[in-house]
């Protein structure tokens, strides 16, 4: 029996797992002991990776839709030719930007790189992905405040922090291994700020049940009180930051009296939270989608960063303003996908970076794309406006997951060509495609992923591919070959080739990985970037900003702030309730296309969409447990749910898990001004007993 160490490709923790394989079958999966991320632990999703493509497995050959709606299977060679010819015809007829793509946060670094090079540099297409839906806010905030999208922490900080503050995060459900690190810490206070009395809130020492989307007001008020009470770290502010005086003047108007009224907390609760921050010696702030997915999300993230900076809680053990990433390689997509910045970072109009990246890739600088991609929402809007004619969807299911998802259904119907590349042919998106390209799951892949704390780890094939089965990397390569892209066919033959290109592109950047050898990642503890050529690995867990130096031109972090914006979707008499969304259970993943293959997960979860409603509101509406209800959204759509009664949501709020397509039928087409990340958490709705 062989033992193969590889990386889980669900969430951004990137647990390592030992796969025990015999006769090309996975006999058991055991979490890797002493791996610095998960140290012998895993959630149910990771230890069930052997279930991928066991109940639902497509024919391994590509297929095309014929005129009568039926499908015809092709050889891979003919499939690549079909994709290349149809993309070329559309580009020639309508122009380069008539073609676009939407990808994921779950491919490898090497696949992101190859796809980004082919689609962006060679074809000049717009390519965005799931990272826009979950982490764009954090990426933009980091870049503006720190000078680069560089989360500074290591997971060890959860075990070293004496005051752990979760804001819009529910790690017990969404990141259970991260929560395990919290439990390892014997000397901590846990604070949760969340409108919902979530699983994490229930296991916290303090819960602040803030009103939905009033985070920014609360955060500015906390800053004002900290300044008034002289609780700031003046030395750190002076030596390592800029624009604090402007911030100090700005927050004066955010008084505790106003915040109490707006946020739904008592003045005493707000003042208590200030004292908890002040009394902590090592305070860490942790946020995820509850902050990232909002109409003023970037400024909310930066308000958290401001609190860490002004109290000196950054760059030290157990501290930091720490974003919790969602998908397994969202961090890799942020720096190595060629979508919002050059490979390895840097703006597309930066002449020095353009020259270095072109040299690293061995191409003429003129081949490099010269602007960022259109964001996800603009791609959908341009399809519906008739400007984008072809869309290539890779490893994602936007018919379900896109906000206000009926707009994506409309878009699919308007396309001349929809290509879907996925491990399943029966997702809501796959079923609508013109060309389907089947890919193998992660247990048959090779490459690299980067986790939420910047750790590169190896994805290594645990099972041999069967006849006609291909990795995403091989599919991209085959299409590039059919397109006649000699630069790719000659130089990007293997994932290792792509990794070495990205390594060269990273030289001199904050994410420098020139000291990482592809082969050395296998059977290792992973390596956090930066790791430059000549560096020696002294410890498995390293943090950034320990020297107080940031990646801005003057090496100082910036205090950034902006007046709290008016909510674009206020409640009204017609739509009096707020519709909040999030993960339902530990075992479910996104649109359930993968986790539906785990029997004990599916046995435990609802087969129908459900939502939580406050018991008092339910009583007033005549709604009882398991009643069927209709929820009507201001976006014009309605959906049916099963009602679950609870005291864990406020009277005027509803909560629905994202794993059912009905949920995002109701979410709004509202986006943060800077990150263009959708505001998934704050639709306004009304609710009725079915049949009323």
Placement of each model-derived feature along the sequence:
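N-terminal leader/propeptide and maturation segments of large enzyme subunits in energy/redox metabolism
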Residues: 69, 229-267, 344-359, 363-368, ...
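A short, gly/pro- and small-residue-rich
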Residues: 174-190, 305-306, 404-418, 455-458
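Flexible glycine/proline-rich, aromatic-decorated loop/lid segments
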Residues: 196-199, 423-460
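A glycine-rich, hydrophobic/aromatic-adjacent loop/helix-cap motif
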Residues: 278-379, 453, 537-539, 548-551
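Long, contiguous, secondary-structure-rich segments that constitute the structural scaffold
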Residues: 466, 472-527, 595-611, 616-692
């Amino acid at each position: 029996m062989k033992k193969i160490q590889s990386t889980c490709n669900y969430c951004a923790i990137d647990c390592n797992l030992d796969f025990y394989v015999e006769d090309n079958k996975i006999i058991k999966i055991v979490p890797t002991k002493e791996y610095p991320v998960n140290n012998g632990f895993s959630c149910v999703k990771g230890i069930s990776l052997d279930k991928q493509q066991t109940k639902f497995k497509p024919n391994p050959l590509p297929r095309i839709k014929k005129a009568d709606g039926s499908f015809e299977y092709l050889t891979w060679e003919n499939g690549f030719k079909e994709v290349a010819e149809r993309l070329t015809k559309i580009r020639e007829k309508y122009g380069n930007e008539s073609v676009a793509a939407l990808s994921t946060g779950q491919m490898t670094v090497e696949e992101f790189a190859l796809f980004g090079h082919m689609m962006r540099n060679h074809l000049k297409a717009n390519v965005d992905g799931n990272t826009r839906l979950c982490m764009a806010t954090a990426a933009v905030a980091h870049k503006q405040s720190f000078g680069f999208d560089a989360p500074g922490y290591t997971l060890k900080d959860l075990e070293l922090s004496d005051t752990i503050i979760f804001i819009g995060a529910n790690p017990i459900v969404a990141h259970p291994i991260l929560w395990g690190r919290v439990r390892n810490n014997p000397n901590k206070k846990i604070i949760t700020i969340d409108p919902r009395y979530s699983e994490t809130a229930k296991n916290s020492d303090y819960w602040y049940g803030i009103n939905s989307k009033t985070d920014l007001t609360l955060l500015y008020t906390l800053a004002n009180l900290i300044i008034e009470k002289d609780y700031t770290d003046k030395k750190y502010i002076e030596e390592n930051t800029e624009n604090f005086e402007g911030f100090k003047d700005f927050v004066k108007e955010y008084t505790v009296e106003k915040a109490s009224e707006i946020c739904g907390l008592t003045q005493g609760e707000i003042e208590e939270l200030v004292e908890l921050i002040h009394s902590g010696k090592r305070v860490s702030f942790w946020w995820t989608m509850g902050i990232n997915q909002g109409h003023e999300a970037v400024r909310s993230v930066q308000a958290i960063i401001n609190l860490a900076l002004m109290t000196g809680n950054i760059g030290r053990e157990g501290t930091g303003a720490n974003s919790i990433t969602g998908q397994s390689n969202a961090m890799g997509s942020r720096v190595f996908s060629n979508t919002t910045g050059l490979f390895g970072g840097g703006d597309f109009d930066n002449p020095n970076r353009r020259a270095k990246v072109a040299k690293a890739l061995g191409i003429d600088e003129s081949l490099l794309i010269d602007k960022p991609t259109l964001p996800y929402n603009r791609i959908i809007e341009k399809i519906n406006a008739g400007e984008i004619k072809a869309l290539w969807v890779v490893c994602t299911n936007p018919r379900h997951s896109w906000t206000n998802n009926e707009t994506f259904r409309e878009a699919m119907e308007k396309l001349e060509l929809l290509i879907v590349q996925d491990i399943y042919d029966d997702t809501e998106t796959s079923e609508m495609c013109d060309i389907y390209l089947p890919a193998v799951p992660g247990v048959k892949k090779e490459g690299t992923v980067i986790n939420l704390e910047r750790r590169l780890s190896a994805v290594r094939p645990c099972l041999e591919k069967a006849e006609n089965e291909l990795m995403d990397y091989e599919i991209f390569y085959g299409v590039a070959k059919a397109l006649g892209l000699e630069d790719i066919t000659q130089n990007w033959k293997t994932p290792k080739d792509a990794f070495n290109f990205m390594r060269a592109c990273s030289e001199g950047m904050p994410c420098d990985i020139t000291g990482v050898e592809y082969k050395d990642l296998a059977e290792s503890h992973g390596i956090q970037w930066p790791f430059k050529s000549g560096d020696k690995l002294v410890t498995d867990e390293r943090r950034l900003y320990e020297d107080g130096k940031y990646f801005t031109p003057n090496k100082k972090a910036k205090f950034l702030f902006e007046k709290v914006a008016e909510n674009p979707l206020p409640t009204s008499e017609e739509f009096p309730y707020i519709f909040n969304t999030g993960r339902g259970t530990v075992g479910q993943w996104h649109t359930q296309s993968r986790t539906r293959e785990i029997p004990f997960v599916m046995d435990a979860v609802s087969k129908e969409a459900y939502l939580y409603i406050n018991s008092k509101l339910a009583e007033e509406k005549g709604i009882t447990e398991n009643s069927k209800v209709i929820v009507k959204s201001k976006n014009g759509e309605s959906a049916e749910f099963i009602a679950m009664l609870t005291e864990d949501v406020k009277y005027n709020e509803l909560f629905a898990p994202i794993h059912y397509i009905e949920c995002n039928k109701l979410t709004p087409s509202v986006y943060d001004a800077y990150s263009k990340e959708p505001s998934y958490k704050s639709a306004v709705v009304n609710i009725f007993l079915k049949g009323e």
